[in-house]
Amino acid sequence: MLTDLQLPVGARITPAFTLTIKNKVLEENISARIISLSVTDNSGFTADTLNLTFDDSDGQLQMPVRGTVLHLHLGWSKQALYDCGYFTVDTVTHSGSPDKIGVVARSADFRGSFDNKISQSYDDYTLGAIVRIISSRNKLDLPVIPQELDSVKIPHIDQTSETDSYFLTRLAQRYGAQVTVKNGAILFFKAGTGRTSSGQAIPWKTIVRSDGDNHNYQMVDKKAYDGVKAQWHDLKTATTSSVALKRSPAEGKEAQPASYIAGSGTNVLELGKIFPDEETAKRAADSVFNQIQNDAATFSIRLALGRADLSAQSPVNVQGFKDVIDSQRWVIDSALHEINEKGFTTKLILKPYVADITYQSSILQL
């Protein structure tokens, strides 16, 4: 159960928020006009989104200007509010009757330099150095990237008529990471590991069935691959070799017999591309297999009492469902927080936690 939601005994449970526009807290009479508010915290390069609907039935509201920066804090009355970050107004609508103003704001403004196509070659850089070059080019704050990714050596890679957003996404996919832009900085991190973008462990949460009013579990048929094979060619020796990474149980743990995503022990996916060296081949195999595991199952649940402190990449255990669901460890892929006439709820979409998956590596010269 989510026992760290500390609400006063006997108190009226009331959602609360503050919305700051241009460093000024939204006036109370305007806040009272908000019909609905929702904020989606996403993983990956999909920007977090803030949706607001205002009552303009008397025609007295001014429509906000695109590019305006909003800052949201969300939670419950008489409790510390959670900082949901900064959002840039992207879309404004007016509809009726009765008249309403709709506002969509996003955590990153991709309308500027991120949309420009760039051609550049990177020779003998680290992954972190490339990310910092892109960050500087787009006039962002210093990026946040854990040391294990920052130090990855890249002998050569080309950005050929690609936007920086597309190129960053390609880099993330190649090295088993995710990338996003939040609060003016690029975050480049390992997905599904329950860690912050800087590599710090996020505390585990436990959700029991009574915390939610509906849920859905889905197992996707990915042939339950339990390994990935990649080949590389050494130009100096003119030899081609392959590396196979096969899943093995984490140390000290037994494989879950009910798991749908562990693999059968015989299904190995072979990558068609020939890589330039062993390290690149290993990283490619690791990245692809982690993605297969991450996509193998999805579990969603709507919490009856909203939890603004639950965000993407937080690790979660669940209890009170089927064994195959409870035995799987999860990480939050996205969190949708909503305030409307029904109250404050949070919908979570969970993906498998992959940090405790270990591999057996075997190398074969072809």
Features from the language model and the residues they span:
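Short beta-strand-centered interaction patches in the first periplasmic/extracellular domains
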Residues: 2-3, 7, 100, 106-109, ...
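An acidic/polar, Gly/Ser/Thr-rich interaction patch typically located in mid-to-C-terminal regions
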Residues: 33, 37-65, 211-366
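Beta-strand-connecting loop/turn residues
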Residues: 48, 99, 184-185, 342
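Amphipathic, non-transmembrane alpha-helical segments in extracytoplasmic/periplasmic proteins
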Residues: 51-53, 105, 119-143, 158-182, ...
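Conserved "cap/hinge" positions at secondary-structure junctions
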Residues: 74-76, 190, 320
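Short, compositionally biased
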Residues: 86-95, 120, 157, 193-195, ...
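Short acidic, glycine/proline-rich loop/turn micro-motifs
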Residues: 114-118
